[in-house]
C-alpha cells in the first residue's frame, strides 16, 4: 500500500526488494498509478484477494485510513513503515493510540509504525527499504532501531552470518518484543534469538515470554539506555517510558536472557550459540603456536567464569610423546612457532580427548610453516568428531580470510582477539546454566488479605499515603515475623502493653519498687513524621517503670516538632538484640515497566553506604529468593563467617517470598522498606517498616 516507482522513495525500495527473491505473489496498491515496476496497481487493498501481509508506506495523514481499509478487507497482518507517531510529539502519540484502537477492532497483527520492515529468508521475503537482503541462517533478530537493522545485515553478510527472521520493531504499537520471542521460540528453524532494545513495552509479559522460551532457545539482547543520558535519548527516539536500569538487569536475568553491552558481543555470542554445542564442563584447553597470545588468552579465561582445564596425567604423557621437547605440555599448550598443521591437529586431538576439557580455543599466528586453510580443515573435522565447542583465533588479516570463511561455514566462530573467543565460550557456559534452570511457580502462602486491605484502606480514609510502624499489622497479616508489640494512644495503655510484653512496672505508670524486666522500644506513630529518630521520636531499652513518662515525652516531642502532625499514638515493642543477628533489608519499589521489584541486602545503617543489595521482579519464587540471599556480598556473614552461627536462611528466604506476595496482591503499595530485617539463627524478624501507597489503586 503506497507502492511507487519514484526514484529514491521508500515505496519503490520496498517494492523492488519484494520482487527480488520473494517466493510468493507481490501486489501493488496505489490508486494514482496503473503500474509500478511491472506490477499492475490496484486502487484499494479490498480489490486484492487473499492478502497475507499488507505493507503500509503511505503519508501519515492517510495511514490510519489505509490500516482500517486493510482490516475491513480481511487482512490480518500489517507492517507500518510510515513514521510520525509516538516518536514525534502529542499529535503523533494520539495517532498511535488510534492505530491501536483500529488494530483491536479488526484483530490486526501490526509491526511498527516507524518500522524499517521485516525479512524472512526462508521465503525470500525482504519487505524493508534496506539496501540488501540477509543471508539465510538460524538466527532471528529484532531491533528497535531500523538503522541498526541495515547496518547489521550488511555487517553479517560480510561475515557469512545468516538470519531466519529480521524484524524492525518500530514503535511497537501492537506487536512487541514479547510477541516475537514467543513466536520464534516455537519456530524449529530459529536456533538463537537476538535483539536490540531501547525499552520493553510490557515488562512482566516479556519476563514470562522469555522465561518460557530461554530454556530451549538462547536469547541475547543489547539493552541500550543504561545511563541517564542514554535513557533520555531512547525515550526521545521511541516515545517510551523507560524502566529503571536495575529493573532491566533483574528482569533479563530472571528471564534467562543473556545481556550484552556491545554489538560485537551480541553477534559473537549469537554466532557461537547458533553454531556450537554447549560445553559439558567449564574447563578450557588452549592450543597455540604463539606464547604471548597464549598468555593473553589464559588471562581472559581467568577473567571469566570458565577455568583453565587441568589435563590428566595420560593427556600430559600424550603431549610429551607428540610434541617437541621445547613445547609446553600443560595448559596453555604451546606447540612452538614452527608448528606445521600436523602438529596443531595432533595437539588439538589430544586436548579434546581429555575428560576435563569442555571447550577449546585454537590460537594461531601466521608462519611460513603453517597453512591456515589446512588448519581450518583440521579444526572443522576434530570439532565434528568430538562434538565439543571450539572457538578459533587465526590472527592476521588477508592470510586468514579464506580459512576464517571455511570455519564460519562449518559453524565455528572466528575472532582476531582471543579475549572475544573466551567471552563467547563463556556465553555458551552461561546459557548452559540457564538451560538447566528449574523454574518453579512462586508459592502462594495462606495469608489474611482482608486484614491487610483494611490497614491500607484505613490509611486512605485518613488521607495519608505513608505508613510507618502502623504497617506492622500488614506484615503480620502476611505471616512475616515481627517483634511483639502494639500501638497505644494513652499512657495507661502504654504501661499495660509494656507489662504484657516484658512484665514489671505499675499500672498507673509510676515508678514501681520492684522495677524489673527487660526494656521495650517506644516509637512515635505518625504518617507525617518519617524520620522519627531525627526528632527524638524513638526511645530504646525503656524500663517498664519509665514507660508512662516516656509515652508523654514522645508525644510532646512530636507535637513540638510538627504541631499539625497527625499523631496516631506510640508503638510499644519488645527489644530485639541486633547484635545477635545480621541486620538486612527487604523491600520493594514499583517500576513503570516491570511492576513490583523486590529488594534484599545488607541493612541497618549500611544500606546507602555499601549498597549491597539485589533485586528481582515479583512474584519471587523460592529459588529466586535463595539466589538473592546468596548473591549479596554480605552472604558469608549470613552463613557463619568468622565463627558466627549461621542465620536461619530458610526464614529469610520465606520472608522475601511473603513480601513478594504482599506487594503483588496490592498494587496500591508503591514503596516498602523493612529495615532492619534482623536475621538470626532462630529466624528473621521485621523490626521496622515504612511504606508508601497510591490511594487511587485501592
Residue ranges and their predicted role:
Residues 1-672, 677-698:
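Catalytic-core regions of core metabolic enzymes
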Amino acid at each position: 500500500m503506497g507502492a511507487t516507482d519514484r526514484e529514491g522513495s521508500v515505496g519503490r525500495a520496498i517494492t523492488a526488494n519484494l520482487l527480488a527473491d520473494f517466493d510468493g505473489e507481490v501486489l501493488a496498491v496505489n490508486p494514482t498509478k496503473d503500474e509500478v515496476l511491472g506490477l499492475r496497481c490496484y486502487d484499494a487493498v479490498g480489490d486484492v484477494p487473499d492478502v497475507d501481509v499488507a505493507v503500509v508506506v503511505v503519508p501519515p495523514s492517510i495511514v490510519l485510513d489505509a490500516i482500517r481499509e486493510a482490516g475491513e478487507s480481511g487482512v490480518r497482518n500489517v507492517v507500518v513503515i510510515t513514521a510520525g507517531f509516538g516518536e514525534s510529539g502529542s499529535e503523533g502519540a494520539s495517532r498511535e493510540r488510534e492505530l491501536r484502537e483500529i488494530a483491536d477492532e479488526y484483530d490486526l497483527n501490526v509491526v511498527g509504525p516507524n518500522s524499517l520492515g521485516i525479512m524472512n529468508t526462508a521465503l525470500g521475503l525482504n519487505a524493508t527499504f534496506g539496501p540488501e537482503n540477509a543471508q539465510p541462517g538460524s538466527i532471528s533478530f529484532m531491533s528497535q532501531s531500523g538503522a541498526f537493522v541495515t547496518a547489521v545485515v550488511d555487517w553479517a553478510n560480510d561475515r557469512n552470518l545468516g538470519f531466519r527472521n529480521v524484524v524492525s520493531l518500530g514503535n511497537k504499537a501492537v506487536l512487541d518484543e514479547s510477541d516475537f520471542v514467543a513466536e520464534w521460540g516455537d519456530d524449529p528453524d530459529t536456533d538463537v534469538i537476538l535483539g536490540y532494545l531501547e525499552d520493553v513495552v510490557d515488562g512482566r509479559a516479556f519476563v514470562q515470554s522469555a522465561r518460557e522460551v530461554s530454556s530451549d532457545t538462547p536469547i541475547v539482547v543489547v539493552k541500550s539506555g543504561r545511563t541517564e543520558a542514554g535513557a533520555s535519548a531512547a525515550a526521545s527516539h521511541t516515545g517510551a517510558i523507560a524502566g529503571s536500569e536495575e529493573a532491566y538487569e533483574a528482569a533479563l536475568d530472571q528471564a534467562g536472557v543473556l545481556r550484552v553491552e556491545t554489538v560485537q558481543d551480541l553477534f559473537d555470542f549469537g554466532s557461537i550459540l547458533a553454531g556450537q554445542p554447549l560445553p559439558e564442563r567449564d574447563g578450557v584447553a588452549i592450543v597455540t603456536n604463539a606464547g604471548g597470545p597464549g598468555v593473553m588468552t589464559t588471562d581472559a579465561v581467568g577473567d571469566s567464569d570458565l577455568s583453565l582445564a587441568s589435563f590428566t596425567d595420560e593427556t600430559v604423557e600424550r603431549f610429551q610423546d607428540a610434541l617437541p621437547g621445547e613445547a609446553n605440555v600443560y595448559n596453555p599448550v604451546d606447540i612452538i612457532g614452527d608448528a606445521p598443521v600436523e602438529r596443531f591437529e595432533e595437539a588439538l586431538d589430544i586436548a579434546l580427548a581429555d575428560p576435563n576439557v569442555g571447550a577449546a580455543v585454537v590460537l594461531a599466528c601466521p608462519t611460513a610453516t603453517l597453512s591456515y586453510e589446512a588448519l581450518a580443515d583440521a579444526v572443522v573435522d576434530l570439532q565434528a568428531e568430538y562434538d565439543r565447542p571450539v572457538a578459533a583465533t587465526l590472527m592476521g588479516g588477508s592470510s586468514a580470510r579464506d580459512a576464517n570463511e571455511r570455519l564460519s561455514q562449518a559453524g565455528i566462530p572466528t575472532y582476531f582477539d582471543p579475549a572475544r573467543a573466551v567471552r563467547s565460550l563463556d556465553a555458551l557456559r552461561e546459557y548452559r546454566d540457564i538451560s538447566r534452570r528449574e523454574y518453579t511457580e512462586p508459592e502462594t502462602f495462606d495469608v489474611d488479605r482482608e486484614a491487610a486491605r483494611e490497614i491500607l484502606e484505613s490509611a486512605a480514609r485518613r488521607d495519608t499515603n505513608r505508613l510507618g510502624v502502623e504497617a506492622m499489622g500488614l506484615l503480620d497479616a502476611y505471616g512475616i515475623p515481627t517483634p511483639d508489640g502494639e500501638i497505644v494512644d494513652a499512657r495507661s495503655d502504654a504501661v499495660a502493653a509494656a507489662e504484657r510484653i516484658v512484665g514489671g512496672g505499675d499500672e498507673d505508670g509510676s515508678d514501681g519498687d520492684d522495677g524489673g524486666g527487660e526494656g521495650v522500644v517506644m516509637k512515635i506513630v505518625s504518617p507525617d513524621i518519617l524520620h522519627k529518630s531525627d526528632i527524638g521520636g524513638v526511645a530504646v531499652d525503656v524500663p517498664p517503670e519509665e514507660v508512662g513518662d516516656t509515652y508523654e515525652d514522645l508525644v510532646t516531642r512530636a507535637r513540638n516538632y510538627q504541631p499539625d502532625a497527625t499523631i496516631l499514638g506510640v508503638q510499644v515493642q519488645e527489644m530485639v538484640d541486633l547484635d545477635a543477628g545480621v541486620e538486612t533489608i527487604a523491600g520493594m519499589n514499583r517500576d513503570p515497566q516491570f511492576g513490583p521489584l523486590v529488594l534484599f541486602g545488607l541493612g541497618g545503617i549500611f544500606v546507602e553506604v555499601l549498597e549491597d543489595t539485589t533485586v528481582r521482579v515479583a512474584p519471587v519464587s523460592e529459588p529466586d529468593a535463595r539466589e538473592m540471599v546468596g548473591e549479596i556480598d554480605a552472604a558469608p556473614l549470613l552463613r557463619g563467617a568468622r565463627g558466627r552461627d549461621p542465620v536461619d536462611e530458610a526464614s529469610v528466604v520465606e520472608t522475601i517470598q511473603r513480601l513478594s506476595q504482599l506487594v503483588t496482591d496490592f498494587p496500591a503499595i508503591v514503596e516498602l522498606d523493612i529495615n532492619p530485617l534482623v536475621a538470626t539463627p532462630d529466624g528473621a524478624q521485621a523490626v521496622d517498616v515504612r511504606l508508601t501507597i497510591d490511594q487511587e489503586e485501592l
